[in-house]
């Protein structure tokens, strides 16, 4: 999704790097705080509600452009861009905060369900599932970025705006090839948040129903 955010919206790699850094810091602190809270609450509901709220925060991220327009009444310009970046940054931090509700209740439930003689093996399988899930999301998002979105490559204004966002000059053949590739799937980055969010929300419902 990051190349799409950069091409469509002009969000710099620096801003994206700040988002990721804040997300990581907040996530680490959240796991500590949520570990204390999860010991005092219903673990199943705690995990399900946390996952559902995390999915909603991710879903909201895809509406960054719309929220910025609702607030500023503008479709472009520095005020529009800054408001959008602020909203997305807040959503990303909230996402990190809510992600921290996953590990503590899982660890608590697993130690209750699994006998000590099997705990290390089952915990290893559980930990591996995180990496497998992350890998599948990367594949899914790669597919989304290459197939979804709106083709605006025939719109000279849209192409010029993307070229400016990416810092590509009209005479740069290699750079313009990158711009045209992005223009063929404008807005696809939104689906990189919406589709995984829908899957996560369905998982949260499944936790309540089947766990």
PLM ranges: what are they?
Residues 24-32, 134-135:
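Residue-level signature of mid-helix packing/kink "hotspots" within the transmembrane helices
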Residues 190-209:
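Symmetry-related core transmembrane helices of the 12-TM Major Facilitator Superfamily/SLC fold
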